Amino acid sequence: MGVTKKPDLNDPVLRAKLAKGMGHNYYGEPAWPNDLLYIFPVVILGTIACNVGLAVLEPSMIGEPADPFATPLEILPEWYFFPVFQILRTVPNKLLGVLLMVSVPAGLVTVPFLENVNKFQNPFRRPVATTVFLIGTAVSLWLGIGATLPIEKSLTLGLF
């Protein structure tokens, strides 16, 4: 076991640090060598052993074998690609679809330059960033849900 050092709350240096919100690691058990040298490797090796044990004792099958001669009627990507898939599916010009996909990260990069984000952490005091986030989330959900529907209903989600 490591040496446990009790805090001296009468120490003016510690009191000054605690008043500033610092100095919480001034006392207690040191992380080196006890935690970093002995406990962390045991935890990491234990986690690896559990994963290997589960993989050996209970292997899960990935799915049914692929049949290259049977193609489904509509191929859908993974769920996190639904909005991008919907953009490519509905825009008639593929170059325009690719430009729309590139404009999303480019637009997100410009948001910090539109307003001074470093000054405030409250989202209500950053209206441009909050508006971009809310509109982007709504559009992404709209496109993601529309990608699961047939092409005729995909833009209106079958509501209109």
Curated annotation (Swiss-Prot):
- From the Swiss-Prot or TrEMBL record, give the protein name: Cytochrome b6-f complex subunit 4
Membrane topology note: Multi-pass membrane protein
- Give the matching SUPFAM superfamilies: a domain/subunit of cytochrome bc1 complex (Ubiquinol-cytochrome c reductase) (SSF81648)
Q: What family does the database annotate?
A: Belongs to the cytochrome b family. PetD subfamily.
Q: Which PANTHER family match?
A: CYTOCHROME B, CYTOCHROME B_B6 C-TERMINAL REGION PROFILE DOMAIN-CONTAINING PROTEIN
Chain segments annotated as transmembrane: 36-56, 95-115, 131-151
Per its database record, what is this protein's job? Component of the cytochrome b6-f complex, which mediates electron transfer between photosystem II (PSII) and photosystem I (PSI), cyclic electron flow around PSI, and state transitions.
Location relative to the cell: Plastid, Chloroplast thylakoid membrane
Give the coiled coil ranges: none
Tell me a GO cellular component.
Answer: chloroplast thylakoid membrane
Q: What GO terms describe the biological role, i.e. biological process, of this protein? A: mitochondrial electron transport, ubiquinol to cytochrome c; photosynthetic electron transport chain
Q: List the disulfide bonds.
A: none
Identify the Pfam families for this entry: Cytochrom_B_C (PF00032)
Q: Which GO terms describe its molecular function?
A: electron transporter, transferring electrons within cytochrome b6/f complex of photosystem II activity; electron transporter, transferring electrons within the cyclic electron transport pathway of photosynthesis activity; ubiquinol-cytochrome-c reductase activity
Q: How does it assemble?
A: The 4 large subunits of the cytochrome b6-f complex are cytochrome b6, subunit IV (17 kDa polypeptide, petD), cytochrome f and the Rieske protein, while the 4 small subunits are petG, petL, petM and petN. The complex functions as a dimer.
Taxonomy of origin reads: Eukaryota, Viridiplantae, Streptophyta, Embryophyta, Tracheophyta
Q: Which UniProt keywords apply?
A: Chloroplast, Electron transport, Membrane, Photosynthesis, Plastid, Thylakoid, Transmembrane, Transmembrane helix, Transport
